[in-house]
A protein has these predicted regions:
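Conserved structural motif at the start of ABC-family nucleotide-binding domains
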Residues: 4-6, 19-21, 26
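Short coil-to-beta microelement around the adenine-binding A-loop and adjacent beta1/P-loop entry
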Residues: 16-17, 76
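The feature captures the beta-strand-to-loop junction immediately N-terminal to the Walker
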Residues: 35-37
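Helix-to-loop junction immediately C-terminal to a conserved catalytic motif
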Residues: 50
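ABC ATPase NBD Q-loop/coupling interface
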Residues: 61-77, 141
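ABC-family P-loop ATPase nucleotide-binding domains
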Residues: 90-163
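Walker B catalytic motif
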Residues: 169-170, 177
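Conserved beta-strand-loop-alpha-helix hinge in the C-terminal portion
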Residues: 218, 222-245
Length: 273
């Protein structure tokens, strides 16, 4: 069993504090829904856990099974069992998908995987995600549709079998059938090789399919509410306004907008900075 612990995490980007004291624990077998309005720190949290250099941890800790994640490089975090599926997967020209995935698998093993076993596992994962076999021989994400990119992230996750998986809007841009395919494969892997999951999504339908164990709502870089599937359903039906009123919270983006008066616009009619 693995445990990812985030304690009092503060993260800044270009001297602007984005996360302001996040506390979160994810255990093997759990699925955590990370919710909140756009621009309130959800993706920042995932990026900080994975070690993206743009996101600077200024306070707090991240541990995986008691080991200091912040002391690890991105590669070391990956080898330790942390996986991040990006919202916008990058294209890698000149590197075939199969070569990239084989290298990723071998980086997590003490001895290289046999070619026969790798091909068998890759073919199975591609088939499970309802992708065409030719995708293995194309350059990574080059010319892939948005849906192919997202499903290819799940192919990689199935091959790596991480301890902790962070999925950043893995369902965005997918049609109804593709969303179900992705959700089914997440649950299948969870059953075959249990992991802890943290999933960012704006769609209740996706959460209905993966059935999160816990739900967390992030606003202004803080977790303001926690619950389970019932919280997900209430937000889907009523939005976030009731929660903001209950907690007496104003979105920081709205605070900025209120500072822009008619007078300031009149003094700057062309919008010059």
């Amino acid at each position: 069993m693995s445990t990812l612990e985030v304690k009092d995490l503060h993260v800044s980007v270009e001297d602007k504090e984005i996360l302001k004291g996040i506390n979160l624990t994810v255990n093997t077998g759990e699925i955590h829904a990370l919710m909140g309005p756009n621009g309130n720190g959800k993706s920042t949290l995932l990026m900080a856990i994975m070690g993206h250099p743009t996101y600077h941890v200024t306070q707090g800790s991240i541990t995986l099974d008691g080991k200091d994640v912040l002391a690890m490089s991105v590669d070391e975090r990956s080898k330790a069992g942390i996986f991040l599926a990006l919202q916008y997967p990058a294209e890698i020209n000149g590197v075939t998908n199969s070569d990239f995935l084989k290298a990723a698998v071998n980086a997590h093993r003490e001895t290289p995987i046999s070619l026969f076993k790798f091909i068998r596992e890759l073919d199975t994962a591609i088939e499970d995600l309802k992708l065409k076999g030719e995708i293995a021989h194309r350059f990574v994400n080059e010319g892939f549709s948005g849906g192919e990119k997202k499903r290819n992230e799940i192919v990689q996750m199935k091959l790596l079998k991480p301890a902790i998986a962070l999925l950043d809007e893995i369902d965005s841009g997918l049609d109804v059938d593709a969303i179900k395919i992705v959700a089914d494969n997440i649950l299948q892997l969870q059953e075959e090789s249990p992991m802890g999951l943290m999933i960012v999504s704006h769609y209740d339908r996706f959460y209905q399919l993966v059935k999160p164990t816990f739900a967390h709502v992030m606003v202004n870089g803080q977790i303001i509410a926690e619950g389970d599937q019932q919280l997900v359903e209430k937000i889907d039906s009523e939005g976030y306004e009731w929660l903001l009123k209950e907690k007496n919270i104003i979105l920081e983006s709205e605070k900025v907008e209120k500072k822009i008066s008619l007078g300031s616009c009149a003094n700057n009619p062309r919008g010059n900075k």
